[in-house]
Amino acid sequence: MNLINEKLNNLENNAAKSPKEAVVLLNMGGPNSLYEVGVFLKNMFDDPFILTIKNNFMRKMVGKMIVNSRIEKSKKIYEKLGGKSPLTPITFALTERLNELDPSRFYTYAMRYTPPYASMVLQDLALKEVESLVFFSMYPQYSSTTTLSSFNDAFNALKSLETFRPKVRVIERFYADKKLNEIILNTILSALNNRKSQDFVLIFSVHGLPKSIVDAGDTYQQECEHHVSLLKELMQQKNIPFKEVLLSYQSKLGPMKWLEPSTEELIEKHRKSHVIIYPLAFTIDNSETLYELDMQYRLMAERLAIKEYLVCPCLNDSIEFAKFIIGLVENLKSE
C-alpha cells in the first residue's frame, strides 16, 4: 500500500502544472492488504445500495453478521492472490497509461470500499484547482449496486468540499459501444490462441444480483442481456462462430433468490464441451475473476473432466482499453 501511495503521490505531483480537467475512474476497490479485508467487507455491507435494508440499525447489524461470517474465508482467498486484491494496482497502472497517452487531462481513481476514497481524491483535485471533472464508472453496465453507489459516494464527497465547485459530467455505462465490443472479441480470440471457436461454449459471466433488486427496477439484467446480444451480432458480422454463447451470473451470497443461471450451473451443464469464460461485467481483474473464475471454477472443471477450460483476462491496463476510455471522454466533451 505504501508503494502504491508513493507512486500515486509522484504521479499527482508530476501533474501539478496540471490540466484543468480531471477524469476520476470509479470502482468498488479491494483490500490492499490482509488487514484491509475487514474494512472492505464492513464498508461494502454497510452500503444501502448493496444491503437494501431501510432501517439503518438493522442494516448495520445484518452487515456485521455477514462480515463476521465471511472475513476468514475472504482472507484465505486474498492470501491465494498474494495478500491483496489486484484491482487497485492494475487501476493505478491504467491511470499511468492514460496520463501518458492524454496529458491534456489528469486521470486518477477513487474506490468505493477501500482507499483511495472519493473524499481523499477530490480534496487533492481541489488543491490542484481542477475546473472540470468526469466521473467515469468502470462498470460497463449500469446497476444501482455499483454505478449509482459509486456516483452517490462521489457526489456526496464533492458536496462536502464547500469551495470546490467544478463542472461535472459523468459516464455511467458504455457496454453498447462497438469499439468496446471489438476489444472484448479480440480478447476472447487472443485467449483462444488459434483454437477453433466453434469447438467452444462461450460463457459471459457477470456478477449476480438478488432478484429482488432487479424486480425493484434495476436495469442491470436487461443491460447484460442486451450486451450479450450485441456481441453475438458482432460475432456474426465477423464470422466467428461458437458452439453456444451464454450469459451466466456468479458470486451468489446468502439464501435469497438470485439471477440465473449461475456460472457454476452452466459449467456443469457443458461438462462434455470445451468452455471459455469472459468476465463481462468487470473491466479490471479482481478476486471474482482471478480466484472465483480462474481458480475455484477451474478446479470444478477439472473434477468434471471438461475437455478444456479457458478464462479470459479483463481489459485491465491494456493500451486498447486506455484509448477507448480517452475516446469516450473526448466524445463527452463534443456532445
From Swiss-Prot:
GO BP term, example: heme biosynthetic process
Q: Which residues bind Fe cation?
A: H207, E288
Q: What GO cellular component term, any one, is given?
A: cytoplasm
InterPro entries according to UniProt = Ferrochelatase, Ferrochelatase_AS, Ferrochelatase_C, Ferrochelatase_N
Which top-rank group of organisms is this from? Answer: Bacteria
Q: What is its main location?
A: cytoplasm
**Cellular compartments annotated:** Cytoplasm
Molecular function (GO) terms listed? ferrochelatase activity; metal ion binding
Per the UniProt record, one Pfam family is Ferrochelatase
EC identifiers of the protein:
4.98.1.1
Enumerate the UniProt keywords alphabetically.
Answer: Cytoplasm, Heme biosynthesis, Iron, Lyase, Metal-binding, Porphyrin biosynthesis
Q: In which pathway does it act?
A: Porphyrin-containing compound metabolism; protoheme biosynthesis; protoheme from protoporphyrin-IX: step 1/1
Q: Which reaction does it catalyse?
A: heme b + 2 H(+) = protoporphyrin IX + Fe(2+)
Q: Which PANTHER family match?
A: FERROCHELATASE, FERROCHELATASE, MITOCHONDRIAL
Of which family is this protein a member? Answer: Belongs to the ferrochelatase family.
This chain's function reads: Catalyzes the ferrous insertion into protoporphyrin IX.
Check the record and name the NCBIfam families matching this protein: hemH (TIGR00109)
Q: What is this protein called?
A: Ferrochelatase
